Amino acid sequence: MAGRSLCLTRSSVPGTPFPPPVQQPSTPGPDLLALEEEYKRLNAELQAKTADVVQQAKEIIRDRQEVRSRPVSTQMKSCDDEDDYSLRGLLPSEGIVHLHSETKPKTKNIDPVNKVQNKLHSANKGRKTNSSVKLKYSDVQTADDVAIPEDFSDFSLAKTISKIEGQLEEEGLPEYIDDIFSGVSNDIGTEAQIRFLKAKLHVMQEELDNVVCECNKKEDEIQNLKSQVKNFEEDFMRQQRTINMQQSQVEKYKTLFEEANKKYDGLQQQLSSVERELENKRRLQKQAASSQSATEVRLNRALEEAEKYKLELSKLRQNNKDIANEEHKKIEVLKSENKKLEKQKGELMIGFKKQLKLIDVLKRQKMHIEAAKMLSFTEEEFMKALEWGNS
């Protein structure tokens, strides 16, 4: 059972998938934390599977040691002892002779019935004891060696009785026949003695049938025990093959465990490097966060100033528009005034030219007057000069 559960629980160990190498992100984020959690989870799974494999390997080794320390012969020892005891009880060294010897008184002479019994069982005595020894020390044996001897297979009560009657008719009763009937009257005839011997043989035949029946039962039990021994041997061979296979699997799992330990060490190193990188990234992230907060503060201030400047710029643009409108109006006014002034200038220039002409005329007149004064011009010349000046 332990081997089957081991095969079921370890089939997932060789193909345990490892996470593919994750590319390091350009910026620190939650991927590193997820990778760290994944490595921790894989570490816990590897430790649990390792403990399970080691425990099951110990159980398999312990079961194998128990099976090796307890061979099949010791497992069947109790059954063999019981069978040997029953067979020894049924087939003792004294045999059936001892059972029937109690029915007659002890005499110094030899009973001819006991001779017949000894003839029937002396050849089988060694076989019965040997068969009991074979049952005790042998794993494979035939039922004929234990159950029924070879001489019993051809035994028949009628043949035995006819044989004894023939011997009695030919030879007569032996001299020591009286020892058989020591407790019976000497007046018993030959027929009565024969009937007595027939009855005794009938009892012996019944007892022999009982013994044969018991032997048949024991033979069936021995066959059952043989089949059990065979099943036990097959089971032992299967268990041995299973143990060998499981030992190879244990070796394979040991190598896989060593490889997993190496991978675990590599993953631990990767995890430590990733943790260091994560710490560096966290420190850089904190620095970036602090600088980002300062930048955001400056940016907010700059945005506020930009908003202020936008408002001021809009105000300035509005003021410039107003000023431009006013200037435009002023320019228009100035243009109109300039036109007026130009017109006045033109008029003044015309007047000035006329005044210059008048001045020239007056100068000429003055010169003429002075010349007239000096030269005493005549009135006519003066009038000409005036006319010339008016023209």
Swiss-Prot record:
Task: Give the primary localization class.
Answer: cytoplasm
Region of interest: Disordered: 1-31, 65-85
Q: Where in the cell is it found?
A: Cytoplasm, Cytoskeleton, Microtubule organizing center, Centrosome, Centriolar satellite
- Which superkingdom heads the taxonomic lineage of this protein's source? Eukaryota
UniProt GO cellular component terms: centriolar satellite; cytoplasm
Keywords attached to this entry = Coiled coil, Cytoplasm, Cytoskeleton
> Is Amino-acid biosynthesis there in the keyword field?
no
- For this entry, the protein name equals Testis-expressed protein 9
User: What organism does the record attribute this protein to?
Assistant: Homo sapiens (Human)
Its taxonomic path starts at: Eukaryota, Metazoa, Chordata, Craniata, Vertebrata
